[in-house]
Amino acid sequence: MRLSYLSLALAIIFVLTIMHASNVEAKASADPEPDAVGSINVKNLMDMIREQITSRLKK
């Protein structure tokens, strides 16, 4: 009889844990690095310059 109470208690704890976990939200604890955004812009700029140079060399 005790085993059934134990399994019932574990099942209730499991269900309550799942129900509580759905209310938890993840939040960022740090700001993004300022260099990360800048390096993306530099990469795009370098790609544009490379395309311009190659298109002018083909003419």
Swiss-Prot record:
The lineage of its organism: Eukaryota, Metazoa, Ecdysozoa, Arthropoda, Hexapoda. It holds the Pfam family Pilosulin. Its main location: secreted. The keyword Cell division does not apply. Expressed by the venom gland. Residues 1-21 form the signal peptide. Residues 22-38 form a propeptide. Keywords: Antimicrobial, Secreted, Signal. May have antimicrobial properties, like most ant linear peptides. It is found in: Secreted. Belongs to the formicidae venom precursor-01 superfamily. InterPro entries: Pilosulin. GO terms for cellular component: extracellular region. This is U-myrmeciitoxin(01)-Mg5a.
